[in-house]
Amino acid sequence: MFTINAEVRKEQGKGASRRLRAANKFPAIIYGGKEAPLAIELDHDKVMNMQAKAEFYSEVLTIVVDGKEIKVKAQDVQRHPYKPKLQHIDFVRA
């Protein structure tokens, strides 16, 4: 079971996403279910190590946002074209 700590994004848009990536974080979103979509930011290195395992894409993950646990599955992963970096992940509530 994977547990990921996340923070709610305060800013959105291209410039805000670039600032996140420069700070070794990256944007993500949680959607699905009856709740509203939630824009979050994740630590790049921690998630990069987790996603190296195949189970990251098949198991239910736990994301902790403001002390609240959300069960999700990775739906879509966007990677940098030539660098070994994650650009964005879509999570769907499980």
Swiss-Prot record:
Gene3D superfamilies: Ribosomal Protein L25, Chain P
Record keyword Cytoplasm present: no
Superkingdom to which the source organism belongs: Bacteria
UniProt xrefs under CDD domains: Ribosomal_L25_TL5_CTC
Gene Ontology molecular function, alphabetical: 5S rRNA binding; structural constituent of ribosome
UniProt key word rRNA-binding: yes
One GO CC term on file: cytosolic large ribosomal subunit
A Gene Ontology BP annotation from the UniProt entry: response to radiation
Keywords: Ribonucleoprotein, Ribosomal protein, RNA-binding, rRNA-binding
Disulfide bonds: none
Subunit text: Part of the 50S ribosomal subunit; part of the 5S rRNA/L5/L18/L25 subcomplex. Contacts the 5S rRNA.
NCBIfam families, alphabetized: PRK05943.1 (NF004612)
Family per similarity comment: Belongs to the bacterial ribosomal protein bL25 family.
Record's function text: This is one of the proteins that binds to the 5S RNA in the ribosome where it forms part of the central protuberance. Binds to the 5S rRNA independently of L5 and L18. Not required for binding of the 5S rRNA/L5/L18 subcomplex to 23S rRNA.
Listed name of the protein: Large ribosomal subunit protein bL25
